[in-house]
Amino acid sequence: MKTQIEQAREGIITPQMAAVAAEEHVSPEYVCRMVAEGKVVIPWNHVRAPKAVGIGKGLRTKVNASIGTSSDIVDYEAEVRKARAAQESGADTLMELSVGGDLDRVRREVIAAVDLPVGNVPLYQAFCEAARKYGDPNRLDPEMLFDLIERQCADGMAFMAVHCGINLYTIERLRRQGYRYGGLVSKGGVSMVGWMMANGRENPLYEQFDRVVGILKKYDTVLSLGNGLRAGAIHDSSDRAQIQELLINCELAEMGREMGCQMLVEGPGHVPLDEVEGNIQLQKRMSGGAPYYMLGPISTDVAPGFDHITAAIGAAQSSRFGADLICYITPAEHLALPNEEDVRQGVKAARVAAYIGDMNKYPEKGRERDREMSKARRDLDWQRQFELALYPEDARAIRASRTPEDEATCTMCGDFCASRGAGRLFAGDLRGDKV
């Protein structure tokens, strides 16, 4: 069975490409061309057939929500509820990142609970199983890892974050650098680095990259090139280790595309705002325009409890400058395993950020909704305001909780409503359109 990218290169518009085109209000031919060039990916798996979602050039910036158990908290029903909450709140994709309990069970229950494309990180389960079996994760047999990747794809994974870009040279780059204020913050990355150092061997995911691609190609699963050496602090952003891994991942993205696999490149998670544009330009240039998956990014390290906001600020910038997929961050980041409400807040913040970014990335089509909202506010048309809101129910609930005496106004201004005053002063004079 041919993959989306292989069919696109033959000029075949698949049902998934047609569905993406209809959702995005672009032509099927455009989607087909972008998939063929590797500038758009459609997370997919013929075993499960999730909702078709396009990620990449010329399309709306998408939002991913990550859930999963930890070694401290294992509640399968809670993870299913979080998955559903993410979908209800507007997430476009979902990553199941459990490291505690029965990992096959939670993955399968989450996949069954939503129709979104679901992704994961195979290294998590691989090292968990090695630790349980041998008492030491560094005794992981690479064959066990490849078997696990196959098993997870067979369960219906639509995309998979695989840490192929860590190799012995990137580790040496990190060591020569002589500092890392935030250390290593990728669970999969630090586990693979530990395995490589303990065994004195190359990363099997890098060494046998063609084997990884072969497995994912069989299912048409998107290969998302994970960033195990990403910066976990803004003062580590764009350091040599991070850029070295990005360089390798961009090379691998090109190789994977040539082999007929859809490729996604992952970006960093902590980036000061002045470095966002350059980071994205570098990735796009080196990868040949592969879709870029930014993990936030968090734009300051001193606001725990509010990292859904710090990440939303970074995400708006990322979307504006060309990032294609944003991973949400919840208020619980750096503090605790997120609960259902954290998930909802994280998705909503990321969606608002992505919308703001798209307004600037696609100004010709991204601002009409805002113009209509402005007119509805000017005219005190509350029903129209709710219809245009990104989250109508949230807006309705706030207004209903503080009912004004005059239904035309709100309790912020009441009798001193500026919109009503302007309407009386200028009547129909302000209802024209800008030339």
Curated annotation (Swiss-Prot):
Substrate binds at residues 95, 124, 163, 186-188, 227-230, 266, 293. [4Fe-4S] cluster binds at residues 410, 413, 417. The keyword Iron applies. It catalyses: 5-amino-1-(5-phospho-beta-D-ribosyl)imidazole + AH2 + S-adenosyl-L-methionine = 5-hydroxybenzimidazole + 5'-deoxyadenosine + formate + L-methionine + A + NH4(+) + phosphate + 2 H(+). Zn(2+) binds at residues 270, 334. GO terms for biological process: cobalamin biosynthetic process; thiamine biosynthetic process. Pfam families: ThiC_Rad_SAM. One of its GO terms (molecular function) is 4 iron, 4 sulfur cluster binding. GO terms for cellular component: cytosol. Binds 1 [4Fe-4S] cluster per subunit. The cluster is coordinated with 3 cysteines and an exchangeable S-adenosyl-L-methionine. Its EC number is 4.1.99.23. Its cofactor is [4Fe-4S] cluster. Keywords: 4Fe-4S, Cobalamin biosynthesis, Iron, Iron-sulfur, Lyase, Metal-binding, S-adenosyl-L-methionine, Zinc. Belongs to the ThiC family. 5-hydroxybenzimidazole synthase subfamily. Homodimer. Catalyzes the conversion of aminoimidazole ribotide (AIR) to 5-hydroxybenzimidazole (5-HBI) in a radical S-adenosyl-L-methionine (SAM)-dependent reaction. Is thus involved in the anaerobic biosynthesis of the benzimidazole lower axial ligand of the cobamide produced by G.sulfurreducens. This is 5-hydroxybenzimidazole synthase. It comes from Geobacter sulfurreducens (strain ATCC 51573 / DSM 12127 / PCA). The gene is bzaF.
